[in-house]
Every structure is written in C-alpha cells, then in structure tokens.
Amino acid sequence: VAGYRGNTFNAPAYITILSEEKDNYLINAGFMAENLVLKLEEMGLSSCFLTSDDSEMIKKVLLINSDLAVATVIAFGYGKKERDTTKLDIHSPSNVSISNKAGHIAPKIAATALAFDSDFNTPYNFDDEYSDPVIADAVYAASLSPSFLNHQNYRFVINGTHIYLFNQLDNVVPDDDNLLGLGAAMLNFYIILASKYSGIGNWRFDTSDIKADFKNPSDYTLVAALDI
C-alpha cells in the first residue's frame, strides 16, 4: 500500500499528507513535503518519500476519516551514518546555505546536466564568470531533492531572469512519484532564489502564453515557469 519499489519501509514514524485531487495537487504536495523534509534534516532526522498506491486503504489502516486523498507518506527517524554528502541548511527565509551532511545518498545526475541556456541545445555554463551564482546554487539545490530511483526527470531552461521547468514522464518512475519529486525540486530551487533575491514571483503552471522554441525533446513537457 505504501513503500518503496514495492517493498515495505519500516520506520519509527511517518507523516501523511492529504490533499484535494485538483490540478497539480501532487506537485504541490511534493513542494510542501520537501519543506517538511528539510525541517526533519535540520532536526538531525533522515527521511524517505514512500510510494502510496492505495489512498483509501492507507486511510483505512491509519483510521483517517477524510474525503481528501493521500498525496504522499514520508517515513522518518534517526538514520545510520554512512558517508558525507550535502544538504540545504535553512536558518531563516533569508539565510539558506548548502553544507556537508553525514549520511547516505545514492548517485544522482550532476547539476550541470540538469540546466540549459535558452534552449536544450545549449548547456548552462556554470563557470563563475558567465553564470549567475545564485541560479547555479538553485539548480544544485534542486539536484539534492528526493527523486524516485534518483531519475530526476526535470530540466531547467534559463533565459536571463526567466526560468522554465520541463518534466519527462517515463515507464520507470510511476507518474505520482515523478510529480512529487518535481514538486520537491521546485521547492529547493525556489528557496535558494528567495533567500538571495527579494520580490521574486511564484512558480506558475499556466504557460500557455509562452511561445518560445526551447528545442526540447518530444518527451519533455514545459510544466512551470518562474520570473526572478
């Protein structure tokens, strides 16, 4: 009913997030859930998004009486120390940094492979003399977000102060898990920008006014945009 790759996931505690089943509700749930995950990390706790295959059964088992759907379940507790990696440190909304963290992380796609300049034919140049260091940090922060099997199906296209987010659905990552991970990446990207720039807009899902040719592969779809 809830687990990871078809297996049960035993943890001392769980967080269940419920939602109305509206447009983009899973992306929104992933966005909110990642905020909770970062708070758990701040408290020294490890966590994991679980696949939720049967909302009604989960509510029945947990004695939840609600018309809302189970959007996601997060398992958390004190994890075993394995090796050093990196994490986001959120000291306040205006003070966010990336630091070393003790724990385990599976290999992920490099941040440099996740971002493009204006279109998919031009990789984003992360060299300090060419790139905006805040945007570079935001892409890196997004790359640290939870992603099912670390597939990281999202891509960023950066055109000056305009950020375009693309997503790929595939046969490996369940669509629900894909969208939850997309929301988590959006949160990490956003909080880095918001910590350095004042007055930035919010992610928007209505991209019908955007007519640019991003030269994106046919399996990548524009899902959101953000103006700095």
Q: How would you label these PLM feature ranges?
A:
Residues 1-228:
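Acidic, surface-exposed loops and disordered segments
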